[in-house]
């Protein structure tokens, strides 16, 4: 058994959120121990099973700055200026995310980011133990047992408090549920995803525009590609589970080849190993996790995907989890006891987590159905015009979520108002030439207060 120090926390999961939290708290003087069920990715390679690239936004970068990790991480990131939309017929068109290159997002490979944060966590003083799968927790006695799956050997510890940063399939959440039900609910989409890869050119470099997120929208399904710093693209097909086409009708490499030849013809030559990768990579599930509570007084707390997993369509899962880490560190600074800190953390983050979960689902519909829709494109034009005229009041949804650190719940509420304005103002119009700008000014000033941080 390991003795427990007065300011010690035990983290379950050495993924992205676990490592960042370990850095933040170690630098504040906490004794941090992290237990990870997998092996050390620096020795045996990354085995997460998910290589969906991550979109790093201002929220995530702010958290990295607080941990002194931004410079190391950004050296591995690739700038994305916007969505490059590939229609079935016609040339690809870039839809910028922001006004200029000061408003971009960054693509980074999950494995590279995890390894960088793991190094920094250990440098900050955190102790990380690999091959430790959480097996049993006695919350009353402060006792936990881990199993090394290589030899089935148990490892037992005493703890002051457990923090679950172990993802959507959280073992700590399951243990907490057995102690006291958390009201867990998971709503799965009727779509799944499959990951593939676009290799670099023979001499290096990208085969398609490297500073964009590429989307092939096809109504009920879509294909996306995010750049890596080595010239590759991590590409993901989102497809229904049933119907035509679907994973039920695309069962092998030959059927996948036929699907791409029909629906993504310009992408087909970019993926030489399509058939092989299709058969090697299993489909992944997509779901939204909600809980009635995230903590057991001061004995255990869930953060990130372990508390509020979301679908990946707003690129905010990691950014939200990183915000969790900073918020938790701040609450631990502000409170003398863990129970109060955990309760304050949950109170501060619950509404925002629910808001971004909702916005992520809505963004899926936008990405697959609307990015090539004329009405949507006209609304985007008007959105840009309104921002240019009243930049502190009419702040685009994407700007609030991605380039600012506006609370997600506030961004959601303002976005709903702004969507109503855009839909009503463009109804019956094919362009912006006949809009009543004086009336729009009155509406914008009446319905939207100036937003902190907007400029």
UniProtKB/Swiss-Prot annotation:
Q: Which GO terms describe its biological process?
A: anthranilate metabolic process; kynurenine metabolic process; L-tryptophan catabolic process; NAD biosynthetic process; quinolinate biosynthetic process
Its recorded reaction(s) are: L-kynurenine + NADPH + O2 + H(+) = 3-hydroxy-L-kynurenine + NADP(+) + H2O
**Which top class of enzyme applies to this chain?**
oxidoreductase
Name the keywords, alphabetized. FAD, Flavoprotein, Monooxygenase, NADP, Oxidoreductase, Pyridine nucleotide biosynthesis
Pathway, according to UniProt?
Cofactor biosynthesis; NAD(+) biosynthesis; quinolinate from L-kynurenine: step 1/3
Cited InterPro entries: FAD-bd, FAD/NAD-bd_sf, Kynurenine_monooxygenase
Q: According to its UniProt record, which protein family does this protein belong to?
A: Belongs to the aromatic-ring hydroxylase family. KMO subfamily.
Q: What does this protein do?
A: Catalyzes the hydroxylation of L-kynurenine (L-Kyn) to form 3-hydroxy-L-kynurenine (L-3OHKyn). Required for synthesis of quinolinic acid.
Q: Which HAMAP family match?
A: Kynurenine_monooxygenase (MF_01971)
Write the protein's name.
Kynurenine 3-monooxygenase
| Chain's gene name | kmo
